[in-house]
Regions:
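Short sequence/structural segments immediately N-terminal
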Residues: 2-190
Length: 190
């Protein structure tokens, strides 16, 4: 016959003090990892981080003189404010990973490191961004620009109609504002 089991046998063999120490240590390590991850995500969402890559430095040049960077109010947005969703950590991490892989591919494989290569690729890059903004209903735009808070009566008729359509989901920001903030790219070569 086998040995009779005593309640709490394993815990008693390990020792209550050891179990508590392991639990507290595990929580501490988890907090350090989570804190380090939060710092890494925060730093990776800065404009300086984004534009540190040669692929994106030319987009940074087009952005520097836009209304989202240089304006009368002093409000400035960065790359992540427009290009990184904040609805979930998973969406944020997926977008950052996807962007990083695509940038590395463009730079190292496609050779997108000269002004000429950038000019050639810009229409496709902006078309990809436009597709993403349409697919997400321009949610990153809507974090700052709330149609419900706009004075529609003070707007011209065309803008008023477009913003009313955006409020009901029939239009999205980039349907009209596709040149914000990087300027209009030339038409994509087919």
């Amino acid at each position: 016959m086998g040995r009779a089991r005593r309640p709490g046998g394993r815990l008693r063999r390990v020792g209550l003090g050891t179990a508590i120490s392991l639990g507290v240590g595990g929580i501490g390590i988890g907090l350090l990892i989570a804190g380090g991850g939060a710092v890494a995500v925060h730093r990776a969402n800065t404009t300086e981080f984004c534009t540190g890559c040669h692929v994106y430095d030319r987009f940074a040049q087009t952005f520097e003189h836009s209304q989202h960077r240089a304006n009368l109010t002093g409000v400035q947005v960065g790359c992540a404010d427009c290009h990184v969703p904040d609805d979930s950590l998973a969406a944020l991490l997926w977008t950052k990973a996807r962007s990083g892989v695509r940038a590395a591919w463009a730079y190292y494989v496609e050779g997108l490191d000269t002004p000429e290569e950038f000019a050639r690729a810009r229409p496709e890059l902006q078309a990809d961004a436009h597709t993403w903004f349409v697919a997400t209903d321009s949610q990153t735009c809507r974090r700052c620009h709330e149609v419900a808070a706009m004075d529609l009566q003070a707007q011209r008729a065309g803008a008023r109609a477009s913003h009313q359509a955006a409020a009901t989901g029939r239009r999205t920001c980039v349907d009209c504002h596709s040149d914000v903030p990087h300027g209009q790219a030339p038409a994509r070569a087919e």
